[in-house]
Design a protein with these regions (language model features):
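N-terminal leader segment of winged-helix/HTH proteins
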Residues: 1-4
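Winged helix-turn-helix DNA-binding recognition segment
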Residues: 13-26, 31-82
Length: 82
């Protein structure tokens, strides 16, 4: 993350969900760091890939995983953290 003072609140249920990959949990944590007070964020896939040190394809896969488990939802270009 470019701003080292950035932080986020992560739900315990996400951290302990055995159905969720550790990579998706890490991405969720990063999304929480980008979220505003309404739990909405809109970082680019490229930015998320850079933050994770992974490919854009991997980030897209983890976003799908988080959506499948209903931890996030997409509305247009924005993600809402549920």
């Amino acid at each position: 993350l470019k701003n080292s003072n950035r932080f986020g609140i992560v739900k315990h249920t996400v951290c302990t969900d055995p159905e969720l990959s550790i990579q998706a949990k890490g991405l969720y944590s990063i999304l929480c760091c980008y979220a505003n007070k309404n739990r909405i964020c809109w970082p680019s896939i490229s930015t998320l890939a850079d933050d994770c040190g992974s490919s854009q394809t991997s980030v897209k896969r983890w976003i799908k995983e988080l959506k499948l488990h209903k931890y996030i939802k997409r509305v247009g270009h924005k993600l809402t953290i549920l």
